[in-house]
């Protein structure tokens, strides 16, 4: 009986250890999978949002990244389509977009994730629409980026952004032309013919 008990305890303890290791590996796998999916939704979705605000086009793709309720309440997107956006007077041809994900956490068993991101648009290329020349400044206004607390929700196996709260503001500085140095006069004037 003593040997049977030892034999059973040996296999039970090994089974428990293997079960714990497999559980940790499965949990880590799902956390990584959720984090990767969320990261893609954040980077692609927020860039598509900025593109839509700057150019007033491409709104058809926003539903892939944002929940419909969020899109209906986003004042920046509404401004792009009702003509109140400061970028509506410009033909934006290109922009640089920088998104830094500072914090991202998604439990494998949870359908809600939160993250902290910093969004910047360091440069915007374009020019004033011909119909608006003289009405607005030739310099395109700087993008008001910032730090955001973003909430995502998984529904139907897809992560979508459902909330975006700005916790800090970052305004890109206006580009100023680099000063050119004044040439120094020749110290040796005798060398001149």
For each predicted feature, which ranges?
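Hydrophobic membrane-insertion alpha-helices, especially the h-region
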Residues: 13-32
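N-terminal Lys/Arg-rich, disordered targeting/topogenic segments
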Residues: 1-11
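Low-complexity, intrinsically disordered terminal/linker segments enriched in charged
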Residues: 129-193
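Beta-strand elements of well-folded, non-transmembrane domains
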Residues: 54, 119-125, 152-156
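Surface-exposed, charged secondary-structure patches
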Residues: 84-136, 191
